[in-house]
Amino acid sequence: MSFNVNWNSLETESLSSWTKELLTDALNSGKRPNILASGIQIKDLNFGKVGPSFEILEIGELDKDRFRGIFKINYEGDFHLTLHTKVQANPLKIYSSNSLDREVNQFDEMNNFVTPDFLLCNDPFALPLDLKLSDIKISGIGIIVFSQTKGLTLVFRNDPLDSIKVSSTFDTVQVLANFLQSQIEDQIGDLFRETLPTLIHELSLKYTSLNESNFSDLQSKLKSKMNNLDTEDLEKISINDVNSEFNYSSTNLRKNMNLFNSRETLNLSIPKLKNIVQRSHLEKFNKHLPNLVSTLNLNLNLPDVNVNNNIAPSQNNNCIPIDLLINNNNNLENILTEISSIQTSSYYNKLNSNNNGSKPNRRVIKLGGKKSKKASSANPLDQTPEYSEVSTLIDDSMEHSTIEHSTFESPVSLEHANLIDLKQPKPMRCTRDISIDTSKPILSHSHFHANGNSNTNSPHHPNSSLLRGVGLGNNYFNFTSNQQISTSHIENDEDRLMNKKSNNYIDIKSINNKSVDSKNIDQWKKLDFDKASLRQNCSSPQHNVFEVPPPPPYQY
């Protein structure tokens, strides 16, 4: 289904003026951007001679109070629109306005005194701009849903704008021309997607919600209101009639009343207000501030500086003397150094006054300090190394020390090159026969050393390197102690204490030497002999392996 639109009937003066007014209100609604120096005006509007083609693709629902359909629109006509405005060409003005919008509400008159007032850089510099839109090509598919209670809804399935030509007074500048082209294409795309459906929906609600009875009632109320304004006088409202209870809280009113009552006194010592400088104390306050110009003249014996008289006295005395820096190039370094020292001293004086005259806390780190000797002299034994039960510290200096192992010895000893001759003890007279069970190996704790006559390797010797148990006086596998164990006296010589070796040291060299003998001992464990060979070997004087040989048989 399709139909033609008589496009020539739109070229009327009333429709053109109404469209211009509607577009002007729509373009100037809301907050104006800071880049524009004036409002937007419709300079020229022409619908052209060629109208769009409108085609209905589908009608989903059709009734007296509702309608839903899908349509297609195509337009390639000679419609053109010309806009006129003024653009702000001062970038500093634009930056200042944007900063005020982000940080301070510039529409509030109470905030004007805290904002800087620039002179030349803040002046507007407006340039006229004429923007012409022509050669518009539109091709889109939309959905229309109408309801008498919900109004008219228009939604496009795609972006209907195909192309548009933008020409302006800045076409000679290619960068600005490209920028305007891209920006306007984006804005017209948003117009078809969001702005146009919203405007059509709001406009439809305005007319569909009013029936004949409601419209007549509204018209009668408007007429009566206009008549009352002409005949009746307006009532005057005094300040006493204003109820401030809803505008101000009781807490704020109480605080303001206390501040007001504190000043209604003839007392000279008026209580001070926090973070407030009163005008009556302003001169005293300015006297305590450092005067940069006078201090420079006093310290460096410089001539007086001529500063602009329009500046306030406090700012005049404390500003950096530009004329002094320009006229004294030879003494520039000294002047800057003096200014830095004055500012530093002023900062520390202010800091000390806030801290009631106390100096600021500084973190002090002392490097290369001497170690105290009191701790070492008081506890000299603390410097000796402490070792645990399983300590494996090594004493390389004790080369003569050996380690003993508890081993199972064979009843028969093999011929060895390093056998040691031990003296045979005299047999004791027994009252009965002593029988020895030679079938089981004898568990002994013999300790072989390089010198059999030396007593230094005895477990009771103080210089022995044998393994010890934990604690003083603990015998190693039930060895009896022949001498009383006593602790050593406390020595004050630090060198001897530092070089003192513990009894728990193990000589690795001796362990490595004994590993060769341990291989032969393992072979001894594999041999097994009978009782006859055992007694024969024990009676021979050549084999003295046992520490205590069995006594010969006796008859009683």
UniProtKB/Swiss-Prot annotation:
Location of the protein in the cell: Mitochondrion outer membrane
Main localization (coarse): mitochondrion
InterPro entries: Mdm34, SMP_LBD
GO biological process terms on file: mitochondrial genome maintenance; mitochondrion-endoplasmic reticulum membrane tethering; phospholipid transport
GO cellular component, one term: ERMES complex
Topological relation to the membrane, as annotated: Multi-pass membrane protein
Entry keyword annotation includes Flavoprotein: no
Record-level Gene Ontology MF annotations: lipid binding
Residue span, SMP-LTD domain: 1-205
Statement: the UniProt record of this protein carries the keyword Mitochondrion: yes
Alphabetically ordered keywords of this record: Lipid transport, Lipid-binding, Membrane, Mitochondrion, Mitochondrion outer membrane, Transmembrane, Transmembrane beta strand, Transport
Entry domain remark: Lacks alpha-helical transmembrane segments, suggesting that it resides in the membrane via beta-sheet conformations similar to those predicted for other outer membrane proteins and porin.
UniProt function note: Component of the ERMES/MDM complex, which serves as a molecular tether to connect the endoplasmic reticulum (ER) and mitochondria. Components of this complex are involved in the control of mitochondrial shape and protein biogenesis, and function in nonvesicular lipid trafficking between the ER and mitochondria. MDM34 is required for the interaction of the ER-resident membrane protein MMM1 and the outer mitochondrial membrane-resident beta-barrel protein MDM10.
Subunit structure: Component of the ER-mitochondria encounter structure (ERMES) or MDM complex, composed of MMM1, MDM10, MDM12 and MDM34.
Family: Belongs to the MDM34 family.
Protein name: Mitochondrial distribution and morphology protein 34
Lineage of the species this protein comes from: Eukaryota, Fungi, Dikarya, Ascomycota, Saccharomycotina
Gene that specifies this protein: MDM34
